Amino acid sequence: MGTQGKVIKCKAAIAWKTGSPLCIEEIEVSPPKACEVRIQVIATCVCPTDINATDPKKKALFPVVLGHECAGIVESVGPGVTNFKPGDKVIPFFAPQCKRCKLCLSPLTNLCGKLRNFKYPTIDQELMEDRTSRFTCKGRSIYHFMGVSSFSQYTVVSEANLARVDDEANLERVCLIGCGFSSGYGAAINTAKVTPSSTCAVFGLGCVGLSAIIGCKIAGASRIIAIDINGEKFPKAKALGATDCLNPRELDKPVQDVITELTAGGVDYSLDCAGTAQTLKAAVDCTVLGWGSCTVVGAKVDKMTIPTVDVILGRSINGTFFGGWKSVDSVPNLVSDYKNKKFDLDLLVTHALPFESINDAIDLMKEGKSIRTILTF
């Protein structure tokens, strides 16, 4: 391509400061350096993590190009890159896999040593590995976000944060595999390890929670209880496999008590995809004593407490990062599974908008009116 080795000028949505709408700007994207790949973003989505990053309580650095769920096409590669070439369809992701570090070499985790700040993984990777940015706007250096920065027509990522996918992949659907779908689906399949004929409770029915329901159903769960304070999400949850839907605001007792009664003692597996203090407590309390397992998929609070006796009596709590998938190895397989109709991503997409309407997409999510909005350039 004629742009290889050159600075590219393109559109991007920049968060200049906390709490303000994103601004569509013209930015300059530098060529990739060693072990980096420059991508033309074809489709991207808004995830709650992008919105939460602008919260003043978070530690995000500004100005920043947000976005971390997308799919695109390789425009050019930096020195030393041999696994990608211009024209490849790719999915970047926030969970790197360098395949060299102690963590990557262990079968026990999907974490990678390239993450520098494990305490705040969602705001890590704000610069490239040489600690510089590939983005500039109006003479200012702009921070990256979670190693992806998909709210730009072009972005630069580490090859450890990228997977080549099927040439026939529908990028406007498989972009969900870059975060939301993989996180929820994998939480059920890989982390909770839901078993056939088991009972499950899924808290929070956004993209991650609905994807967890898909995972529970594919794993063979006999009963899947979906919980959310927005009842408008229940029809979609049932279409994806939920057998029961509960709105805690419409119950006369705590939702965990209702779930315990419905399942004669508690569910085998709970997955908290909402991450509030209330849902974390309920997700633990609704599991059966003896073997009940709670998987924490997302957390909006820094700490959670659990009575010691719960642990002694057999309840367990697991955390999951990117659904437990080793990203570079697993993402191509997930794309193939979608192509082979093992699961359907279409029900997770509620809106499609031009990239310039990104703030409308954010409003739709804040108002609980969308699951995923696909933005295209």
Curated annotation (Swiss-Prot):
Function of the molecule: Catalyzes the NAD-dependent oxidation of either all-trans-retinol or 9-cis-retinol. Also oxidizes long chain omega-hydroxy fatty acids, such as 20-HETE, producing both the intermediate aldehyde, 20-oxoarachidonate and the end product, a dicarboxylic acid, (5Z,8Z,11Z,14Z)-eicosatetraenedioate. Also catalyzes the reduction of benzoquinones.
Name of the protein described by the UniProt record: All-trans-retinol dehydrogenase [NAD(+)] ADH4
UniProt cross-references to CDD domains, sorted A to Z: alcohol_DH_class_I_II_IV
Superkingdom classification of source: Eukaryota
Mechanisms controlling activity: Oxidation of 20-HETE is inhibited by low concentrations of N-heptylformamide. Oxidation of 20-HETE is a decreased by 55-65% by either all-trans-retinol or all-trans-retinoic acid. Strongly inhibited by omega-hydroxy fatty acids.
InterPro entries reported in the protein's UniProt record: ADH-like_C, ADH-like_N, ADH_Zn_CS, GroES-like_sf, NAD(P)-bd_dom_sf
Cellular component per GO, a single term: cytosol
Positions of NAD(+) binding: 49, 204-209, 228, 233, 297-299, 320-322, 372
Subcellular location, record wording: Cytoplasm
Upper taxonomic lineage: Eukaryota, Metazoa, Chordata, Craniata, Vertebrata
Tissue: Liver specific.
GO molecular function annotations of the record: alcohol dehydrogenase (NAD+) activity; aldose reductase (NADPH) activity; all-trans retinal binding; all-trans-retinol dehydrogenase (NAD+) activity; benzaldehyde dehydrogenase (NAD+) activity; NAD binding; NADPH:quinone reductase activity; retinol binding
Subunit structure: Dimer.
Binding site for Zn(2+) 2: C98, C101, C104, C112
Positions bound to Zn(2+) 1: C47, H68, C179
Short name of any one Pfam family annotated for the protein: ADH_N
Cofactor(s) in the UniProt record: Zn(2+)
Example GO BP: fatty acid omega-oxidation
Organism of provenance: Mus musculus (Mouse)
Listed EC numbers: 1.1.1.105
